[in-house]
Amino acid sequence: MNFRVSCLILSCLLALSSCAAQGEELSPAPVAATPSAAAATPSPTPTPTPTPTPVITQAQLDQAVAQAGSDHGAMAVQAAVIRDGEVVLESAWGWAVRDSVAMTPQHKLRCASLTKVAVGLSAALLLDQGLIDPEANLSTYWGSTVCNPYYPDDPVTIDTLLTHTSSLSDSSSLSALKGSAARQRLAGSGFQSLRPGDPASWGYNNYGFSVLGMTLELAAQQPLDQVLGEGLLEPMGIDAAFEGGSVTHTELLAPLYQGGSVSRSVSEMLGYVCNPTPGYRGNFFAGGFTCSAGELAKLAALLSADGVYEGEALLSPEAVAYLETPMETPITYRDSTFYQCRPLRYQEGMYGREGLYYHTGSAYGFYGLLSYDPETGDGVVVFTNGAEGSTDAYGVYAICGEIAQAVYNPA
């Protein structure tokens, strides 16, 4: 659902309703048509048939995945294509375990910042359940003071965390990721001299999503794995978790590679499991979500279909529209300009399309892309392992962008 197009349609409908009402007041009594009047009546113009969106084939996808993997020195690539609210194609290339286990569409990777989309979907579920107010001060959920001392009258909210405008200082310290430490930082010590919620305060913030995940857990009084699992993952047949060791089929976990060497081993991932205490820690909400490209594509398909998957409404259209709603001021970051949504991004003119919603992710040699076209409902999710990390003109990792170009504009 394109937020701006929806607003335009609503305005047009209101205008048409107004015109219709005025027409009823001013219309004269009906007059019988004369032969000359009937002859002057123009014939209705046929509605033009829209040009069909080009569709990539399995063979073309396999070729694009293999070519991109080779072009960018990857250890492995997965890709999944969305069409009409469903995942219709999947492809895999390379090694899940170097020189011994071939990558398959079923293997699971830690998908870095694509995790933030999963956190956003968790927020959408709680929004539908009436358990959160995105505009309420975080103190509502933490039960203690949350205040930026530089701007005490501007609340720090779930919405500011989703849009990277919370004004919290980013932190990679493991100790800062504990709920007790986050509570202290939220009381005042963890903020920058930036106005919460102001687009000028935008700064990509992993720590903010750690705090967001803990906040959602406190609101639900459940671990986020349970919130997302019961609300979406289980109904959609997705075996995924915010911690690698919490997936059911751990035999499908694949190590991450960077520079030809293992950067995150399976044994390390197995040590990360869900903590049952809500708000205890936020270690995995910025980048720990673990799944296959096809499984994440199911979640992207849900968004592209306004919350419906295989005929079942799992999210309200209003909750999806909230995630897709852009801030008014565009953001320029790493040589690309986009509209920050919640937490999706929207960029016009990507890969030959009018515009795409998307998110990228990178860590430990993983480079990924989630994207979909709100006008056509098609999209693509790409996971890569061990590739070089150059970016294209849209700020997307070039290996992912090469596959996206092939999907959105197949020859």
Region locations from a protein language model:
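Short, conserved catalytic-motif segment at the N-terminal edge
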Residues: 56-109, 131, 191
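Short, surface-exposed loop or secondary-structure junction motifs
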Residues: 150-362
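Ser/Thr-rich, Proline-interspersed low-complexity disordered segments
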Residues: 21-55
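Short, well-ordered beta-strand elements
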Residues: 367-387
